[in-house]
């Protein structure tokens, strides 16, 4: 194994604001994303803010998936971190982006735990 973990930091823009503000939808989306990527879900915690926004985490045996949503801006900040090489964090990240109807997606992929972090250029996908 070349790395102890893989981390995808995802910026999602022009998302469906109703989905970004629906705690039940986001929780299901994140649990499904974890399961689709082959992860084992351990704990789930989500919080709905007033007047809008959701933050949450799905703890998986292999690490975690998190979100902070800003429906008023059509924006979500998503992290998917997986230890080892059995789970592909890109599968979960893509599923989440599609589930939130993101029109613009920016990913930064990091390898973790093997020395200094090398931060690559962000990869931007626009689906307008």
UniProtKB/Swiss-Prot annotation:
Which cofactors does this protein require? pyruvate
Post-translational events: Is synthesized initially as an inactive proenzyme. Formation of the active enzyme involves a self-maturation process in which the active site pyruvoyl group is generated from an internal serine residue via an autocatalytic post-translational modification. Two non-identical subunits are generated from the proenzyme in this reaction, and the pyruvate is formed at the N-terminus of the alpha chain, which is derived from the carboxyl end of the proenzyme.
Reactions that this protein is recorded to catalyse: S-adenosyl-L-methionine + H(+) = S-adenosyl 3-(methylsulfanyl)propylamine + CO2
| Cleaved signal peptide residues | none
E.C. designation(s): 4.1.1.50
Site note Cleavage (non-hydrolytic), residues: 62-63
What molecular function terms (GO) are annotated for this protein? adenosylmethionine decarboxylase activity
The family this protein is said to belong to? Belongs to the prokaryotic AdoMetDC family. Type 1 subfamily.
Assembly information from the UniProt record: Heterotetramer of two alpha and two beta chains arranged as a dimer of alpha/beta heterodimers.
Q: What does this protein do?
A: Catalyzes the decarboxylation of S-adenosylmethionine to S-adenosylmethioninamine (dcAdoMet), the propylamine donor required for the synthesis of the polyamines spermine and spermidine from the diamine putrescine.
Q: What is this protein called?
A: S-adenosylmethionine decarboxylase proenzyme
Species for this entry: Exiguobacterium sp. (strain ATCC BAA-1283 / AT1b)
Q: Which gene encodes it?
A: speH
């Amino acid at each position: 194994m070349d790395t102890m973990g893989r981390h995808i930091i995802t910026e999602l823009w022009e998302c469906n604001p109703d989905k970004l503000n629906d705690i039940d939808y986001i929780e299901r989306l994140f649990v499904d994303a974890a399961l689709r990527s082959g992860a084992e879900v351990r704990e789930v915690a989500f919080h709905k803010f007033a007047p809008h926004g959701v933050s949450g985490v799905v703890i998986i045996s292999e690490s975690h998936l998190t979100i902070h949503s800003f429906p008023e801006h059509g924006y979500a900040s998503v992290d998917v971190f997986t230890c080892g090489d059995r789970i592909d964090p890109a599968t979960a990240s893509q599923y989440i982006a599609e589930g939130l109807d993101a029109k613009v997606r920016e990913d930064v992929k990091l390898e973790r735990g093997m020395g200094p972090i090398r931060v690559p250029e962000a990869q931007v996908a626009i689906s307008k």
